Amino acid sequence: YTVMDNTVLTAVPLFLFMGYLVERAGIVSRLFFAIRLASHRLPASMAVAALVTCALFSTATGIIGAVVTLMGLLAWPAMIRAGYDKKFASGVICSGGCLGILIPPSIMLIVYSVIAQLSPLRLFAAAIFPGLLLAGLYIMYAVTLAYFNPSIAPKPPKEDIPPRSEILKEVMVSFLPLFSLIILVLSLIHISEPTRLS
């Protein structure tokens, strides 16, 4: 029971609270639709947007449940309305949600560091590259699958795509708040403990 006395565990509810604030502020939904517009030329552009949003939102919440639940409510209905295959859309949401356990600040890594008596900072540093690599592989798989089988992820109609200037403006405005948070968390991760960081 002495494991629960570890002060590192204080970071868990605080990182969860940070994820809740990001979600309630509407940053994630705006980011998803901005990335969808920016990637409209790619096959499975909505799937790409969902996976990128999952990876970015993982840096604010650190758990699977929050990412899967939010993206399931946000991206899944949008993909189904756009004519995406249900199995493909479900796979994208579930795989993207799993990135939360790898990309810092991962709650799982914090708990594991306490149990295994390892440095949480070293675990965070070790998990960044695999997490981003996994996100990239998911995106490549979704794009390749949709390229060879366009029926599972139809391209959006051209009339639904706004001018390039509007897309650029929307991407900049939606990226700025979350990107600032990501830079802050990842830059301080090497010089501070997770408890202080949270």
Segments (PLM) and residue ranges:
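Alpha-helical transmembrane segments of multi-pass membrane transport proteins
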Residues: 1-192, 196-198
